């Protein structure tokens, strides 16, 4: 009986988390691992919220990490982007394992269409586009993505208020999803997030898809996009510096718990509560960006 309970798929997220903890302790030792979290407490605290958001919504952990690091902690956007992709490779992987093991519904056909183009987009972006993108432009692109996401949530709320039911089953057009996934992948290479937002927006706006099902779908796509982007950063571009490595060691123990928890909790809560929470986060981020852009706009006009 105990063996059957342990080998159930619902236990696999726990095994993944325990495996990550065991590896970190083996590599660093318990006291050093704990000390790393304390020394980078601001990053660990940021990712406590970021991982919860990543696991349970269509916003990756980078949607919290990127603005906090660039606007509050004054960390270079290039560093924040590399960190966002890397940390999502752990947190969103844990969330994806939870989604599949707990059989949280997804649009499987959409995942199969979107994954190859999102992978191509993030690869092209990291290798050829990101090195040429100005710092303020990168921040603005991220805020624009979040604004699109907010409008998508508002549209979804309006439809529900007017008793327009969501679609459990959709018939996606392949070309449309491939183009949107490519654009989302490019955005992910610039700011560490984007494939999930673009895909979620398309599902909700064009197909009136179920929000929770669309959310789980976008999390799966962003997981693989992050893994591909992080692999390029680590082994081809060599952009995982000692500074970023320190941030990761502090954040990984947090996100492998927070992301699965977010995936589980957000599959249970009312959609209205989830939407309100996300709109507050987006409003704060866009307000910070407008504040930063204001001096530049004054110079232009």
Show the residue positions of the predicted features.
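Juxtamembrane transmembrane-helix boundary motif
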Residues: 1-50, 71, 77, 98-185, ...
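N-terminal transmembrane alpha-helices
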Residues: 36, 51-56, 85
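Hydrophobic transmembrane alpha-helices of secondary-active solute transporters
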Residues: 50, 54, 184-189, 221, ...
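Residue positions within transmembrane alpha-helices of multi-pass solute transporters
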Residues: 60-61, 93, 120, 227, ...
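Juxtamembrane transmembrane-helix termini in multi-pass membrane transport proteins
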Residues: 62-107
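Transmembrane helix-bundle signature of multi-pass membrane transporters/permeases
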Residues: 81-89, 115, 215-226, 282
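Small-residue-rich alpha-helical segments with characteristic i,i+4
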Residues: 84, 199, 205-219
């Amino acid at each position: 009986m105990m063996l059957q309970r342990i080998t159930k798929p619902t236990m696999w997220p726990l095994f993944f988390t325990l495996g990550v903890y065991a590896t970190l302790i083996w590599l660093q030792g318990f006291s050093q691992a704990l000390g790393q979290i304390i020394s980078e407490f601001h990053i660990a605290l940021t990712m406590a919220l970021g991982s919860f958001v990543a696991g349970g919504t269509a916003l990756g952990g980078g949607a919290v990490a990127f603005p906090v690091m660039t606007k509050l902690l004054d960390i270079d956007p290039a560093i924040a982007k590399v960190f966002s992709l890397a940390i999502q490779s752990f947190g969103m992987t844990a969330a994806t394992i939870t989604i599949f093991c707990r059989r949280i519904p997804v649009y499987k056909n959409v995942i199969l269409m979107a994954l190859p183009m999102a992978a191509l987009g993030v690869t092209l972006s990291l290798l050829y586009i990101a090195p040429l993108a100005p710092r303020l432009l990168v921040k603005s692109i991220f805020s624009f993505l979040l604004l699109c996401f907010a409008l998508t949530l508002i549209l979804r709320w309006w439809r529900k208020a007017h008793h327009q039911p969501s679609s459990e089953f959709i018939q996606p057009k392949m070309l449309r999803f491939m183009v949107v996934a490519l654009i989302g992948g490019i955005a992910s290479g610039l700011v560490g997030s984007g494939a999930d937002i673009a895909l979620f927006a398309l599902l909700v706006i064009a197909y009136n898809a179920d929000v929770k099902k669309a959310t789980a779908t976008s999390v799966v796509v962003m997981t693989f996009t992050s893994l591909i982007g992080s692999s390029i950063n680590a082994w081809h571009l060599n952009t995982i510096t000692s500074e970023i490595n320190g941030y990761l060691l502090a954040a990984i123990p947090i996100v492998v718990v927070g992301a699965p928890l977010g995936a589980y909790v957000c599959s249970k809560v009312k959609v209205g509560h989830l939407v309100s929470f996300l709109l507050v986060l987006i409003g704060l981020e866009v307000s910070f960006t407008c504040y930063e852009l204001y001096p530049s706009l004054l110079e232009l006009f």
